[in-house]
């Protein structure tokens, strides 16, 4: 069963609906105290980094997520949820993240591409990955974002994508910590397979 954290900044309905379609039991909850009952935790996210971190902290999800990881259990961050895993972000100022993946969240700059990136883009694998099992390399996924993750540790990068003249980290996989910048719940069969792989890990 998958615990989907409701901290007021998530695409909860579409994520829950995707698991329901896959026949995988998932629960949406705004109570951090309930997280310890589940082996899999998903942190969705749509919105701005600062308010999202404030909400996580206020509801106690920050410590609950760290404790979950310390127990060797797996977690998946989606879009903003991925960015919250990093150490800090420059979005609308300087904000500290969960710091479970060392690195920064930076803004795209481009004179040619329109920002934010909205739409389909391909994903190039950097290593054998649990998340991308049975998903062909360079599959297309759906993105909506103006900021990207820049992890300090290259070995944590599971996949990259090219946008705004830059190859950026579009997926992270590290000791049961998983994160994707794209929205798997909006990415057709490839995205559903990613969610299935996480749930079955």
Swiss-Prot record:
E.C. designation(s): 4.3.2.10, 3.5.1.2
Alphabetized, the UniProt keywords read: Amino-acid biosynthesis, Cytoplasm, Glutamine amidotransferase, Histidine biosynthesis, Hydrolase, Lyase
Q: Does the keyword Endoplasmic reticulum apply?
A: no
Specify whether Amino-acid biosynthesis is a keyword of the entry.
Answer: yes
Q: List the PROSITE patterns.
A: GATASE_TYPE_1 (PS51273)
**Catalysis performed (reactions):** 5-[(5-phospho-1-deoxy-D-ribulos-1-ylimino)methylamino]-1-(5-phospho-beta-D-ribosyl)imidazole-4-carboxamide + L-glutamine = D-erythro-1-(imidazol-4-yl)glycerol 3-phosphate + 5-amino-1-(5-phospho-beta-D-ribosyl)imidazole-4-carboxamide + L-glutamate + H(+); L-glutamine + H2O = L-glutamate + NH4(+)
So which domain of life are we looking at? Bacteria
Return the HAMAP family for the record: HisH
Function according to Swiss-Prot or TrEMBL: IGPS catalyzes the conversion of PRFAR and glutamine to IGP, AICAR and glutamate. The HisH subunit catalyzes the hydrolysis of glutamine to glutamate and ammonia as part of the synthesis of IGP and AICAR. The resulting ammonia molecule is channeled to the active site of HisF.
Annotated protein name in UniProt:
Imidazole glycerol phosphate synthase subunit HisH
Q: Which gene encodes it?
A: hisH
